[in-house]
Amino acid sequence: MKIRLHTLLAVLTAAPLLLAAAGCGSKPPSGSPETGAGAGTVATTPASSPVTLAETGSTLLYPLFNLWGPAFHERYPNVTITAQGTGSGAGIAQAAAGTVNIGASDAYLSEGDMAAHKGLMNIALAISAQQVNYNLPGVSEHLKLNGKVLAAMYQGTIKTWDDPQIAALNPGVNLPGTAVVPLHRSDGSGDTFLFTQYLSKQDPEGWGKSPGFGTTVDFPAVPGALGENGNGGMVTGCAETPGCVAYIGISFLDQASQRGLGEAQLGNSSGNFLLPDAQSIQAAAAGFASKTPANQAISMIDGPAPDGYPIINYEYAIVNNRQKDAATAQTLQAFLHWAITDGNKASFLDQAHFQPLPPAVVKLSDALIATISS
């Protein structure tokens, strides 16, 4: 397997890496005793002074931050939250460099990444999923696809949609002879991290050996293959390209449907084919709550649940536990705590097709949030 997160972070070592106290994660926290910031309890209200928190990263998580930011500002007018959808890779890099307070990511930092860059943390915010879409006019069925077949499509060994391997999964469906056009992310992406993990798990002797998985991978040079930036670019690119197959974050489900893209049923480890709905995502996630470690670095791809959708993940805030001042640390704590409590209500999550964190994972996230200080 090939993971590029460590490479991404290693590039940053040539520049000032973290926030002011980078590398000092073992120092006793120095948060405000009035709020408990950094003192083992979570600040539930922000500082009273004006504070701006900057977020960038995952385009999958971006729609949710666009709901959270204004809602938190309405409750606390002195707090402004800026959000940008730049891709998980950029979010991780900018959080590490200290240019943003929150790097939004669909991909977790490994234990090795965190050990090499003291102070960076994975903080789970919600549960998400990834859909596989396609542009096949005239095909109304939800086609069944699995990781092995998708790997062959992205490697160029399955060249047309009426290939016997696709037909075998979809008996009775009139498949066109349209050329397969694999579409991948051009930017460093947590969506690529998730999708290529799925291919690697279901095709371990093929895709799993090369190119493997990561936020960026060396996609095979398939004639006609295309690359796009962001989930919005993936929706547009696929909608404009007959024969396209694409992996797109669940928060863009409505946009993909509005553009007429088909949505695949994906094969899981039990051989069952499912769409990414609330039931299949929650079924897949249920078995992972008790397995989630304190640092929250865990893959939930292609889990064991027979009725579970195979591409699900925690959405993460990649955060440095040392912020520039006490007001920023307190406000960041308060916002992240709000995000995993009030912000996990259906009124927010349903709009992005996300699922709430289980109570046990909320406790893990809160324990990490409590370590943020100045």
From Swiss-Prot:
The keyword Cell membrane applies. This is Phosphate-binding protein PstS1. Residues 25-48 are annotated as: Disordered. Residues 1-23 form the signal peptide. Keywords: Cell membrane, Lipoprotein, Membrane, Palmitate, Phosphate transport, Secreted, Signal, Transport. GO terms for cellular component: ATP-binding cassette (ABC) transporter complex; extracellular region. SUPFAM superfamilies: Periplasmic binding protein-like II (SSF53850). A lipid is attached at residue 24 (S-diacylglycerol cysteine). GO terms for biological process: phosphate ion transmembrane transport.
